[in-house]
Amino acid sequence: NLRIYGTLRNLGLNFACAFTGFFTALHSHLVNAITGRYYDFSDAAAGFKDLVYDTFKYGINAGNKHYKSPQMAAMDYFEVGSTLESLSRNTNRNRWLNVLQNEWAFGIYSMSDYFIKGQILNSVMYNYKNVNGVFLSKEEYFNKYGRTEDTKDNWKKYKSFKASIKFVNGELKAIDPKDQYAVNKAKFTVGNTAKNLAASADG
């Protein structure tokens, strides 16, 4: 089929275009970290660390179809980017074999999408912290309480949205039940912020 061949050739095998898209998205992510409007470098660094660790752990469990990746659960829940899990359609095969089989031509797009947008989601989740029962972004917090040495020190002590949640059968739950109301109230803002930033990273 010439149409399919053309699509594969022009998209899946166009590595120059794929790498351009990757670096465009990476640039957008770094600009966000520099400006600090939605997250800063500390949030981005923590988000990157989590994504690498989760991907490594996912690789170790590649042969275990029952393993659930917290990173991919978050990306699926908030509908941010593509996940490696979404590429594993044939559950009777090794997960990495599924990725290669199902997305051999589009793999570089899917991997870059996962790698950058996963970081964006993590960074946003780290930027929101539970301040007296309400999740506030760093900017919201300092606008409300002022930027002093005390408020800076206090900010470091608050627990992030990322550290406050877990996924149980695809549902978002607070690790501490008393935080469930705050999590439910903040999840739409957190999710929409990450989704919009991820979309803008596509250029």
Residue ranges of model-derived segments:
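Hydrophobic, often aromatic-rich secondary-structure segments at membrane interfaces
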Residues: 1-203
